[in-house]
C-alpha cells in the first residue's frame, strides 16, 4: 500500500518508471494493472502525456547540414562533396618530387593520414601498436584495412577510440567502424557508417505475411551493416514481424499508416543524404527517400531532448547522424540481470551519441527486436533468451548500409 500511494520522491520515481515501462509494452501491461489501482496508473499516464506533448513541434531545421557558405535551398551536402573518402593517391604539392611525381614514402604517408582523417575516432597510439603486432593488416594498404573481432566468440581488439571505447571492427573499404559501448548495467555496440549515401531502408520480401531477420534483409541488398527500423504489430506477443507498425518509406516507396498518437516522431532520410526529425503527423517531405516512425526523438539539431519517462533500463536501438554526416547505429543489450546486463535509458543513449557529435537521432523499437548485424554475423545479443544468438525477432524492414561498389 505504501509503495502504491506514497509521494516519497524515491519510491514515486521508480513507481513511475515501472508503470510506464509496463504500459508501453504490448503484452506486459498486466504487470502494472494487476496490482496497481487504475487511478494511480491514470495519473502517471496523464503526466506522461504532458511530457510527450511537449515534444510536439520539435523538428530538425531544414538547413542543419548546410555549410555556412552554402546558399539556402542548395541541395547539399551530397555524399561525394562532403564525405571524406580514403584515397591513397592524394598527395600534397609540397610533398612531391621535382617532376611532380610523389615518392612511395609520400604516398604511404598520405594514405595513412587519409585513414586517420576518416576514422578520426581512433586513438592513434593504440592503433599503431595493434598494427605493429599485426603487420599483415596493412598488406593491401591503408584503404583496405579490415579488422573484425566483433563476433560473439571474439574479445575485441586492443585498439581504443579517443573516448576510451574498445574497437571491435574497422572496415576501411566500406567505411565502417564498430565500437564497444558499456557502462553500469549495460553493454552494446555503436556502428559508424562513414558514407550516408549508402544507407536505405529495405523491406522484408515476405512483408504482410511474416518478417525477416535484419541480416537476411541486408544480405539481399548488398548490405554490410544493418539494424532494425520500424516496429511491428505483436498481438499477445505472438507477432511474426510481418505486420508493419506505423509508416515507413523505402527507396521512395511508402508503406503503412502514420502513427496517430501525437508523441510519435519520424526520421526521414532525404536526397541530400541527411537525416531530419519530424512529427509523425507532419507531411512527409517531397525529397524524402527513406523513413521510419517511432518515439521519442533523442537529439534534434544537436540538442538533447530530455525524456523523463523513457528512463527504464531496457534494451535500446537508436539511429542518428553526426555533424560529419556519418550514420550512427546504436544497439544496447539488456534483460540479463544475472549477468549485470539490464539495459539503459534513452537519455543515456543520447549522451553516447552526442559524444560522437550526433546532430539528429531517434529511438527505435527496442527489446528483443533491437539487433545489429555486421558483415555476415550479429554483433549484439537479443534480449530474448531463446533468440539470444540467432538474430532476434523477424522484422518488417531494416536500415541497411550497403557495401562500397
Predicted regions and their residues:
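Gly/Ser/Thr/Pro-rich low-complexity, intrinsically disordered segments
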Residues: 1-405
Amino acid at each position: 500500500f505504501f509503495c502504491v500511494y506514497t509521494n516519497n520522491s524515491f519510491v514515486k520515481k521508480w513507481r513511475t518508471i515501472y508503470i510506464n515501462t509496463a504500459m508501453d509494452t504490448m503484452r506486459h501491461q498486466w504487470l502494472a494493472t494487476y496490482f496497481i489501482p487504475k487511478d494511480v496508473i491514470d495519473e502517471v499516464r496523464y503526466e506522461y502525456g504532458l511530457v510527450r506533448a511537449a515534444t510536439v513541434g520539435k523538428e530538425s531545421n531544414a538547413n542543419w547540414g548546410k555549410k555556412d557558405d552554402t546558399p539556402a535551398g542548395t541541395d547539399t551536402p551530397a555524399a561525394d562533396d562532403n564525405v571524406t573518402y580514403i584515397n591513397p593517391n592524394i598527395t600534397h604539392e609540397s610533398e612531391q618530387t621535382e617532376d611532380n611525381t610523389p615518392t612511395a614514402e609520400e604516398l604511404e604517408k598520405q594514405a595513412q593520414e587519409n585513414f586517420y582523417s576518416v576514422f578520426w575516432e581512433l586513438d592513434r597510439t593504440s592503433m599503431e601498436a595493434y598494427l605493429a603486432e599485426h603487420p599483415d593488416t596493412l598488406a593491401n594498404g591503408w584503404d583496405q584495412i579490415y579488422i573484425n573481432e566483433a563476433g560473439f566468440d571474439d574479445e575485441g581488439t586492443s585498439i581504443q577510440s579517443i573516448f576510451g571505447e574498445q574497437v571491435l571492427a574497422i572496415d576501411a573499404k566500406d567505411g565502417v567502424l564498430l565500437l564497444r559501448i558499456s557502462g553500469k548495467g549495460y553493454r552494446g555496440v555503436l556502428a559508424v557508417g562513414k558514407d550516408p549515401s549508402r544507407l536505405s531502408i529495405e523491406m522484408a520480401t515476405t512483408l504482410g505475411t511474416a518478417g525477416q531477420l535484419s541480416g537476411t534483409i541486408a544480405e539481399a541488398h548488398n548490405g554490410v551493416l544493418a539494424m532494425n527500423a520500424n516496429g511491428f504489430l505483436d498481438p499477445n506477443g505472438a507477432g511474426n514481424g510481418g505486420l508493419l507498425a506505423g509508416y515507413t518509406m523505402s527507396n521512395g516507396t511508402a508503406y503503412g499508416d502514420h502513427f496517430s498518437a501525437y508523441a510519435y516522431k519520424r526520421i526521414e532520410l532525404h536526397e541530400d543524404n541527411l537525416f531530419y526529425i519530424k512529427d509523425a503527423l507532419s507531411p512527409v517531405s517531397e525529397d524524402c527517400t527513406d523513413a521510419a516512425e517511432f518515439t521519442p526523438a533523442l537529439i534534434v539539431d544537436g540538442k538533447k531532448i530530455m525524456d523523463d519517462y523513457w528512463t527504464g533500463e531496457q534494451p535500446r536501438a537508436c539511429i542518428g547522424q553526426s555533424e560529419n554526416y556519418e550514420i550512427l547505429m546504436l544497439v544496447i543489450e539488456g534483460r540479463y540481470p544475472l549477468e549485470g546486463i539490464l539495459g539503459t535509458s534513452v537519455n543515456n543513449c543520447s549522451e553516447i551519441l552526442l559524444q560522437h557529435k550526433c546532430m539528429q537521432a531517434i529511438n527505435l523499437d527496442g527489446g528483443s527486436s533491437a539487433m545489429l548485424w555486421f558483415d555476415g554475423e550479429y554483433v549484439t545479443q537479443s534480449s530474448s533468451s531463446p533468440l539470444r544468438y540467432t538474430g532476434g525477432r523477424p522484422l518488417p524492414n531494416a536500415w541497411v548500409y550497403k557495401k562500397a561498389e
